Regions:
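Helix-to-loop junctions at the C-terminal end of transmembrane segments
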Residues: 94-107, 192
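A late C-terminal transmembrane helix in Major Facilitator Superfamily
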Residues: 160-197
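A membrane-interface helix-boundary motif in multi-pass transporters
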Residues: 1-2, 187-208
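Juxtamembrane intracellular "pre-TM" segments in multi-pass secondary transporters
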Residues: 15-47
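C-terminal membrane-cytosol helix-exit motif in multi-pass small-molecule transporters
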Residues: 2-25, 214-215
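Extracytoplasmic gate region of multi-pass secondary transporters
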Residues: 42-85
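Structural signature of the two symmetry-related core transmembrane helices
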Residues: 109-124
Length: 216
């Protein structure tokens, strides 16, 4: 909830911001752009939707992985909770590796690699073999795929939109991230309760598809 308050505060601050600009120490000017101004920037809406989808994937997978393994693989609850840490290990290892990979690959390339890896992990969950080891590998892949997306989106924002607009755009990106983080895990819970936990990989694939489409 505190994270959500910060996200709403970002949006409120952007809505209140007027025109003009502030000069940085190196002489560069940072434009003060309101929320509507950010949304009018070409490509900004797509990158915001992409950020929302990424955070929806990360948080939904992290919070529902154990329930999925209990419901689909028959895993004991305490073991499933332990296995959920594998997803976070995937993100951690991926972020460490990204520090080296970004020296060779561009931000767009890293985002594409991450998106494809998430998709591969979600597809593995659809294999009609209820095997805890297979699910563990699938969630590791989802975690590895998540690793480069968030930092590479942030890092590429000045390149895509210019340093003068990047501060405002990153603020709105954070707000969309908080909304995706808060909204989608409980919403998936409602969906799973009305249907079955087996829809988790399908939900992940839908968000991956949106994320890929918005990036391209």
């Amino acid at each position: 909830l505190r994270a959500g308050d910060r996200g709403l505060g970002d949006v409120a601050g952007l809505l209140a911001a007027g025109g003009g600009g502030a000069e940085l120490g190196d002489g560069a000017v940072v434009l003060k752009i309101g929320l509507l101004g950010v949304l009018r920037i070409s490509g900004a809406t797509q990158i915001l939707i992409m950020f929302f989808c990424y955070c929806a994937i990360e948080q939904t997978a992290m919070l529902w992985a154990s329930s999925y393994m209990v419901g689909m693989d028959g895993m004991a609850e305490d073991v499933a909770a332990t296995f959920t840490s594998i997803f976070l290990i995937g993100i951690t290892v991926g972020r460490f590796a990204n520090g080296f990979l970004t020296m060779r690959f561009s931000d767009p390339a890293m985002i594409r690699i991450g998106t494809m890896t998430i998709g591969l992990g979600a597809l593995l969950l659809l294999v009609p073999v209820h095997n805890p080891a297979l699910s563990a590998v699938a969630f590791i892949l989802v975690g590895l795929g998540c690793a480069p997306v968030y930092p590479c989106i942030i890092h590429s924002t000045p390149t895509y939109f210019g340093a003068d607009k990047s501060q405002a755009i990153v603020g709105v990106q954070m707000a969309f991230a908080y909304v995706g983080t808060m909204l989608m895990p409980p919403l998936f819970g409602v969906i799973a309760q009305a249907t079955t936990i087996a829809v988790l990989p399908w939900c992940l694939l839908v968000f991956v598809a949106f994320m890929a489409a918005m990036h391209e």
